[in-house]
């Protein structure tokens, strides 16, 4: 998948990310912009999770939505 495809894919899934993690702000979503490590970091920040817990949540979300970064 090239960068343009990944960006388009992110736009499609952005709403689903907000549904899953409602504490993420629009500014957070702009920072994340399809970057998995940024999503994990923002989940840690907003929810007070340890990195491994945030990683597990993202892993689970990826599997449910068949999302590839």
From Swiss-Prot:
InterPro entries: CsbD, UPF0337_stress_rsp, YjbJ, YjbJ_sf. NCBIfam families: PRK10428.1 (NF007748). PANTHER family: UPF0337 PROTEIN YJBJ. Belongs to the UPF0337 (CsbD) family. This is UPF0337 protein YjbJ. It comes from Escherichia coli O6:H1 (strain CFT073 / ATCC 700928 / UPEC). The lineage of its organism: Bacteria, Pseudomonadati, Pseudomonadota, Gammaproteobacteria, Enterobacterales.
């Amino acid at each position: 998948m090239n960068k343009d495809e990944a960006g388009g894919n992110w736009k499609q899934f952005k709403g689903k990310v907000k549904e899953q993690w409602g504490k993420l702000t629009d500014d957070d979503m702009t920072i994340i912009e399809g970057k998995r490590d940024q999503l994990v970091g923002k989940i840690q920040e907003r929810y007070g999770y340890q990195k491994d817990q945030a990683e597990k949540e993202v892993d689970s979300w990826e599997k449910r939505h068949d999302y590839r970064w």
